[in-house]
C-alpha cells in the first residue's frame, strides 16, 4: 500500500519498496517497555544500539535491518522525545541515516560525541 505523501504527518518519509512492510505488534510492545524520553540520564547511543539489536532479530539483510530501525523508532519514544519527533517537519527524514543524524544532533550533541571517543 502506497501512502500519499501530502497527507502524511510523519517526519519519516522513506520512498523505497523495501521499506513497505508491516511491523509485528510484538516488536512495538518490546520497544514501548523502555522508551527513550530525552532526559539527561539517558543515552541516545544506547537507545539506537538497543533498536539495532532488536532489528537483528527481524532480518539478516543490512538494508532491511536499517529500515526496521527507522520503522520502529517512533514507537520507542515517549515524553519530550516523542514531542520533539512529532513536531519535526513532515517528510523531513528520508533515510535511516538521516533519522540517526537528526536524533543524534538533538540528543547526542557534538560535545558528547567527542567525550565518547
Question: What spans do the regions from the language model cover?
Answer:
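Acidic, serine/threonine/proline- and glycine-enriched intrinsically disordered segments
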Residues: 1-117
Amino acid at each position: 500500500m502506497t501512502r500519499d505523501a501530502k497527507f502524511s504527518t510523519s517526519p519519516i518519509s522513506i520512498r523505497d519498496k523495501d521499506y513497505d512492510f508491516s511491523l509485528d505488534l510484538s516488536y512495538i510492545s518490546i520497544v514501548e517497555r523502555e522508551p527513550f524520553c530525552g532526559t539527561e540520564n539517558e543515552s541516545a547511543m544506547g537507545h539506537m544500539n538497543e533498536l539495532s539489536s532488536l532489528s537483528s532479530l527481524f532480518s539478516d539483510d543490512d538494508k532491511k535491518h536499517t529500515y526496521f530501525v527507522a520503522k520502529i523508532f517512533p514507537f520507542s519514544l515517549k515524553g519530550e522525545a516523542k514531542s520533539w519527533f512529532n513536531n519535526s517537519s513532515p517528510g523531513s527524514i528520508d533515510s535511516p541515516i538521516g533519522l540517526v543524524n537528526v536524533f543524534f544532533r538533538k540528543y547526542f550533541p557534538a560535545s558528547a560525541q567527542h567525550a565518547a571517543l
